[in-house]
Amino acid sequence: MRSPPKIKTYSTLSGNEIEICIVPPTQFVTKHQHQLLPNWDVLISYLILVLQRSSVSLKNPITKVNPEKNQLRARFMRFGCSLIFALHDLGAESDLFDPRSGYALLANSDQVLDDNAIVKATLGYQVVSYQQCSLLTHPVWEYKVYPSTIATSASLRVIDFCIDDLTSSLNWQPKL
């Protein structure tokens, strides 16, 4: 039996909590890699899940939720771009999936990735339907979670090095 994935939790300078988890690719990702990342000649070795704690429940009215989701997406895009280019610099294929559209940022993809489905498949978190959307249910944060996904061909050692370097440069503090 495989051990559960290790989740590292960080606190940003503004006090936001972020969880980062490195997991093997799901069956869906493995089966659809060519559609998700058509320009890759190597296999995905790991998915990097980035879960951000939202300041509001994503079950709130859309007028409260949309500005929060935009802010969380922007934070992920900044972090994710820095991480994928650091991994690229060390020779690994890497791409992130835009949480809003589900499409890979760098690939000319015709397949979307559902972040909630990836988290459900890898971490076992529940997903519920709510007003034509699917919401992830975090075991502690409940509906206050914004998931995002990065794919890479890098080794675990290289991923850990890049994440440690990037989180340190951002002054994100690991929570014990």
What spans do the regions from the language model cover?
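Auxiliary alpha/beta "docking" domains used to position bulky ligands
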Residues: 1-175
